[in-house]
Amino acid sequence: MWRDVRYSSVTCFHTQIACWLACQIFLVFHPHTAPRRGHQLKVFDTGSGKTAKPSLEKADETQVEDVNQLNVVGSEDPLDTLPPPPTLSAEEERKLWRKIDLKLMPILTLMYLFSFLDRGNIGNAKLDGLQTQLNLVGNEYNIALTMYFVPYCLFECPANLVLKKFRPSKWLPGITVVWGIVMTLMGLVKTYPELVGVRVCLGVAEAGLFPGVVYYLSLWYPRHMLQWRVGLFYGAASIAGAFSGLLAFGINFMSGTRGLLGWSWIFILEGIATVCVGLLAFTVLVDFPATSRFLTPDERAFVIWRKKYDNSSVGEEEHFEMRHLVQAVTDWQVWLHILIYMSIVGPLYGITLFLPTIIKDFGHNVPISQLLTVPPYVFATTVLLIFAYWSDRTKMRFPFILAGQLMCLIGFSINISNAPSGVKYFGVFLCVAGSYAAFPGIISWLGNNLSGQYKRGVGMALHIGIGNFAGAIASNIYRTQDAPRFIIGHGCELMFVGIGLITLPIAVITYKRINHRRDEVTRAALEKGETNLYTPRELREMGDRAPDFRYTL
């Protein structure tokens, strides 16, 4: 029945080619053999209309066998076998996840804080003399912003595949050190071409962090525990916005030290701090659950089992095949979610890169403008964490994404109007909070609804990589000549939000219809007592199209 449902999408040819080449290189490093057939499991055949009553005869045995056979690609010392997963009480399970949180989240959050700080501090540097000293005229400043996003978007998909080869504990800290060095060198640029060149290098170096960390977290946490972690991780971005304003205010007093203006010291000091964080991450970060020595063998088995059988009776596929790439590129939900992603990331980058300028045009001087960027980000961090917590508690994503979109709609509508500056500053709070608070939900939502490690990895990289081109657009819509109302800039942001308000209901309605139809097929099968056999391998290959998979709303 379900095989009769067909979806079509417009794909980006160059992105497919880049991903295909990356996958071919990946396969050279990771030859694999086909998994052996496991126990047969009675399930519903939603493609042919034949149904079967689920059987528990082999379920536990099959799960234990799959956990024991798990081979972790990319680890130096892979564990071929693991003990059967232990039975944990609710309190013991909470302690285990807390143990994992304390190991993973602090360093990942710190790394992303500096990542967002380093990409967005150019907005503060602009007020501290960057544009004047480098003689940037016309749209040169906007072009410098845009050139960051081009390699950042293009390299995100290949970077997620490379992560599996070089291991998270080496790849993520390594790129952190590299972009920290690039950021330090940005403080020494003397001309516009040098600034553009360094921004391009920064985009290349930072491309692998965000999609890599989100994919990495999806390998550790069940899907309805993911948004809170992504929220904690991404909360560093909003904290970075507040931190950037405070740092810029303080560093401004160093202007003239050793012949460098304040904008140079912003880049140099924050770049050096990033390098230190990257070096620290080499000693702290771990790889995959099956090779993590801070967990006991029983704890590793439980984490793998809990994640592997999350919303699936037979678990996810662990090996790579070219069809995973094809499935990700041709999946309707990836392309629909890209539009939803753009509806938030466009406003997010627009307000992040130009907030100091927008506030300055309210009539404040430079130091006060830097300080006034702090409260909106503090408010945004609070709203983000509230949204993330309740989204995981309710196991729903779209209501919180919708709330963020509506906040952006109201905030940008206020700022495009002739309202007094105090009212517009209130609108800024809504713009910042709405875009930042909705973002983790968008990322987690697609990750929840893509089944299979490699399909999820490629799909999420496409989602983030292509969606981030909205950031390139946002970096060009706030022009100096449009101050103080920035009608074009705020108008484009309202356009992005409008796209989201159209595509979000489409996704929700489609997911509901699919879930409802699968429930009906299940109910009819139980009533008729009809059976059909699928092997665990066949169910794993079906992934999120399997009859027992339910989409998160």
Residue ranges and their predicted role:
Residues 2-6, 12, 19, 25-114, ...:
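Intracellular terminal tails of multi-pass secondary transporters
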Residues 123-152:
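Extracellular/periplasmic helix-loop-helix junction of adjacent transmembrane segments
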Residues 135, 166-167, 188-193, 205, ...:
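Helix-breaking motifs and short loop linkers at transmembrane-helix boundaries and internal kinks
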Residues 146-159, 378-383:
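Central cavity-lining transmembrane alpha-helices of secondary-active solute carriers
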Residues 154-189:
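Conserved MFS/SLC helix-loop-helix module at the cytosolic interface between two early adjacent transmembrane helices
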Residues 178-190, 407-419:
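C-terminal ends and interior cores of transmembrane alpha-helices
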Residues 230-252, 274, 464-473:
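Glycine-rich segments within core transmembrane alpha-helices of 12-TM secondary carriers
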Residues 328-382:
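Extracytoplasmic gate region of multi-pass secondary transporters
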